[in-house]
């Protein structure tokens, strides 16, 4: 998104719109699917040779759950977007694209979970335990899994 500094009114200007999710550079990411455009609402003002941009950005995405690997939809939002850009003499435009991209990517959870109650996958057979129990036999401590081998190292 490019703001033309020369067209900003003395009282500031409002910008509403959508940006292509292509600016994120995440095409083909196996853990995330884009479900809509990046939406924004900004207010831009020139204050003491600086362009100050405040507002909100957001987008809908489907993320892979870190426990069960199923996809779930969520909205990523920053309700307090704030940036200041120096505007030297002769500069007519300021590009916000990289800052919008950075903000959206930093808002994504590194270990997204579909629900706090998600049971995940069986470590032996890989069945999604949210869909029901698997037929694996529990190990000595009552849980299915191969981690019991590590307990023997003590």
Task: Label each PLM-derived region with a short phrase.
Residues 1-62:
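A positional/architectural concept
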Residues 1-12, 73, 82-154:
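Charge-rich, low-complexity linker and terminal segments
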Residues 18, 43-45, 75, 114, ...:
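Generic signature of intrinsically disordered, low-complexity segments enriched in small/polar residues
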Residues 37, 71-73:
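Short, mixed charged/polar active-site loops
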Residues 68:
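Conformational-control "hinges and anchors"
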Residues 54, 73-79:
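A short coil-to-beta-strand element that immediately follows conserved catalytic motifs
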């Amino acid at each position: 998104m490019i703001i033309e500094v020369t067209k900003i009114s003395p009282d500031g200007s409002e910008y509403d719109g959508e940006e292509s999710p292509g600016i994120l550079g995440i095409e083909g990411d196996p853990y995330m699917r884009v479900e809509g455009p990046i939406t924004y609402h900004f207010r831009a003002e020139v204050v003491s040779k600086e362009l100050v941009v405040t507002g909100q950005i957001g987008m809908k995405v489907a993320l892979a759950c870190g426990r069960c690997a199923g996809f779930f939809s969520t909205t990523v939002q920053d309700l307090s977007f704030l940036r200041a850009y120096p505007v030297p003499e002769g500069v007519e435009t300021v590009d916000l694209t990289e800052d919008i991209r950075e903000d959206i990517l930093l808002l994504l959870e590194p270990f997204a979970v579909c629900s706090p109650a998600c049971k995940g996958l069986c470590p032996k057979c890989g069945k999604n335990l949210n869909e029901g129990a698997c037929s694996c036999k529990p190990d000595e401590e009552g849980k299915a899994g191969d981690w019991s081998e590590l307990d023997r190292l003590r």
